[in-house]
């Protein structure tokens, strides 16, 4: 709703990352005309759809800010080990994390491809170093504050009739 802030963790971008890496689109229940496209055409279409959707949001007064948190392979390993070794963090870890780690370099290539294909002036990407959490949080806060400062955030003005109705209450 207007005046609200929403945060999407991964969102529709998951559909062009994991799905593309593992060819999961082949199992989609979609019209043959869609599934018969070769893989490059299929995902080029997805990128175009994302750009158009974000353009639509922008043109309807929504602000889209996309942040990619880049964690190095060494830092990822360190965080995984912390999650395994620390019982308070066990819930954050899944064996599937290790399986996906084998694709680290492939994911980096796809992240770059997706960011390049979907970045726009109206819906920019911010690729941030994320090995040092304090610094990443600082950068994210700066981006969010800047976005909020450049957003119209005036309260709606009630019509004279609506104001009178309030007085009558």
Annotate each language-model stretch with its function.
Residues 62-75, 95-99, 120-136:
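Phosphate-binding beta-loop-alpha motif at adenosine-nucleotide cofactor sites
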Residues 21-25, 81-86, 142-145:
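Short secondary-structure boundary/capping segments
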Residues 64, 72-75, 79-90, 109:
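Domain-level detector of nuclease and nuclease-like folds
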Residues 1, 56-62, 118-120:
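Conserved catalytic network of the ASCE P-loop NTPase/AAA+ motor domain
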Residues 14-19, 73-80, 135-138:
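Switch/connector loops and helix/strand junctions flanking conserved nucleotide-binding motifs
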Residues 103, 107-169:
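NTP-dependent small-molecule kinase module
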